[in-house]
Design a protein with these regions (language model features):
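Proline- and Ser/Thr-rich low-complexity, intrinsically disordered segments
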Residues: 1-189
Length: 189
């Protein structure tokens, strides 16, 4: 048997010099160009007259397995290890950022920022292999600058902090999301 992605098969008889017959096979060379999934019977004829003998062989053309690598995905470079899921299970993952091909572990930090083509390959019980790809976009972290350290007096006077890029969100004790801070005691915040 062969897989449907096989270009051609040359049938070989034990005794050369005979003739092949059957749908699509070359009579002299025994070359059959694979076109469709199914069973194909070919006859080999050798000899002449009362010494004419024939034999048949069946070639099975197996379909490729249907393989899915999933939908395209995006991760931040610091997202940590991600598990890719393909179907059917039991295949192998390859590509930049894959750190364990059999379990589909993808590390965005290893891949780095950019768009990466990841391949999932699967071999079925007929030894037919097929694959699918998924695009994984790894986004780099934005540059963020909270500005210079600032010394304030312990007075209830609000100060608006500024960072770059603008329109970020501030998080901390005594500060609003918009960056307004009112001192409330001595110390470092």
């Amino acid at each position: 048997s062969v897989c449907e992605d096989t270009a051609s098969v040359t049938m070989v008889a034990n005794q050369s010099g005979g003739t092949w017959s059957g749908n699509g096979i070359d009579a002299t060379s025994g070359l059959y160009t694979v076109s469709n999934v199914g069973n194909y019977t070919f006859t080999y004829t050798y000899g002449t007259g009362t010494c004419l003998v024939t034999d048949q062989v069946t070639l099975t053309v197996n379909a490729l397995p249907v393989v899915g690598a999933g939908n395209d995905v995006s991760y931040c470079v610091d997202a940590g290890l991600q598990t890719m899921v393909g179907s059917p299970s039991g295949g192998t993952w390859t590509g930049l950022g894959i750190t364990n091909g059999s379990s589909g572990i993808f590390d965005p930090d290893v891949a780095g920022a950019g768009i990466h083509t990841i391949v999932y390959s699967y071999v079925d019980g007929n030894s037919c292999e097929n694959s699918d790809t998924v695009l994984v976009t790894v986004n780099g972290l934005p540059y963020v600058d909270a500005g210079l350290d600032t010394n304030l007096c312990n007075q209830p006077i609000s100060v608006t902090l500024s960072g770059s890029p603008a329109n970020g969100i501030w998080i901390g004790s005594g500060i609003t999301l918009g960056g307004v801070y009112t001192p409330n005691g001595v110390g470092t915040t």
